[in-house]
Amino acid sequence: NLVQFSNMIQCANHGSRPTRHYVDYGCYCGWGGSGTPVDELDRCCQTH
């Protein structure tokens, strides 16, 4: 869910970027998703 996503992002980047910057990040972070993940963070979004 989006609350867990927000918590994961805050933990992973140590608060260096606001969570909202990732809502439309890569191919899988945010709503829906398709294609090839662009990096490890996007791959994590694909998995979860």
Curated annotation (Swiss-Prot):
Q: Which cofactor does it need?
A: Ca(2+)
Question: EC class of this enzyme?
Answer: hydrolase
A Pfam short name: Phospholip_A2_1
Alphabetical GO CC annotations of the entry are: extracellular region
What is the tissue specificity? Expressed by the venom gland.
S-S bridge residues? 29-45
Q: Which reaction does it catalyse?
A: a 1,2-diacyl-sn-glycero-3-phosphocholine + H2O = a 1-acyl-sn-glycero-3-phosphocholine + a fatty acid + H(+)
Q: Which family does it belong to?
A: Belongs to the phospholipase A2 family. Group I subfamily.
What is the role of this chain? Snake venom phospholipase A2 (PLA2) that inhibits collagen-induced platelet aggregation. In terms of inhibition of platelet aggregation, superbin d is less potent as superbin a, b, and c. PLA2 catalyzes the calcium-dependent hydrolysis of the 2-acyl groups in 3-sn-phosphoglycerides.
Protein name per Swiss-Prot or TrEMBL: Phospholipase A2 superbin d
